Structure formats: structure tokens, C-alpha cells
């Protein structure tokens, strides 16, 4: 309900404001569970395939994605650094680009840097390494440098798998029974919007898989 109300408020603000690629509506942590994400909302005069780049602390850390054509742009921003003035570049189809600063706040009880990582930017190829907990810790995503670029502040636990529709499946944050039985499995996107909680009689823990029929 809280996420639904937030989404309705964001849409109302977009419709009532004069937001453009140069001056977008920026919402950090739009669904309350991932403070290293944001939404950029604005309108374009015609349908455009907008490209977003979250600038890394060095060039190899850039994360870029091009979105399908639309006039109403509601664009997820992934890969922000914590407690940092992140630069996000909005590029239109004609090559016009605008820089937007997305500032994130300090996150308590979260390691900003992995203790050890041994990989390269070429091997990671713009991807993040996701780690999920089995207990009191919280899920995170780390880049080739070991910098945290994705973090859930609610205890979604155990296995995290990509779903066929592009979302993720991860254990619910609602504890059902001790020591680790949760209510079921959540289907969410990487920004943190929860689409469905699949409640499992007796609870869920450790692992799940998506069947061929979904």
C-alpha cells in the first residue's frame, strides 16, 4: 500500500509539473527499500529512446542503459554510490545530453566496500555481483572495485534469481517462524518495487526456481 501511494504521488507530480530532460523530477529510493536507486521522471516532445549513464568513480565504473521509446519517461536509475553526489547523464536520441546530480545519504550498518574482491572491469562488463543473506545481514550488489552500488534496507533473504520477465525473485522480508522461515517469495524489480508476494503455506527458506509456465 505504501509503495502504491508513493507511485500515485509520483505520477501526479509528473503530470502536474513541467519536467524535462534538462530538469527532471528526481526521486531517490522511490519504493523505500533500496536507497541506492532513483527514478527520473520527465516528458519529451516526441517518443524518444533515452539513454541513461550513471557515472562511475572511474570510467570503467559507468553503468549505461537505453530505454524503449516513450514520451512519458519514468526511468529507473541503478548503480548509485552511497553518501555521494552521483552524476547521471540523460542523453536524447539527437545526442543532446544533460547532467543530473543525484545525492544519496549515509546508510547505517552497510559496508560501502567489499573486504576482498579479485576481478576486473572487463570480466564484470558493467554487471554487479549480488550477495544475499541467510540471517541478520542485508542484500547488496558490488562492482568490480568492490564498491557497493545496490543495497536493500529490508531483510529480503536467501536465494535471489532473475525471473523471465526481467524482475527478480527473492525471499520475503516478513518472518513467519523462527529461525528463518519467511512468508514466501517476492517478485520485485531492482529499484525495489514489489509486484507480488507469493505466500507459501508453512513458509519459505533457502531456494526457489521459476517453472516453465511462470
Explain the meaning of each model-derived region.
Residues 28, 59-67:
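Low-complexity "stalk/linker" and mucin-like segments enriched in Ser/Thr/Pro/Ala/Gly
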Residues 5, 12, 16-54, 73-74, ...:
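Histidine-/acidic-rich catalytic cores in large beta-rich domains
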Residues 68-76:
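Aromatic sugar-binding surface patches on proteins
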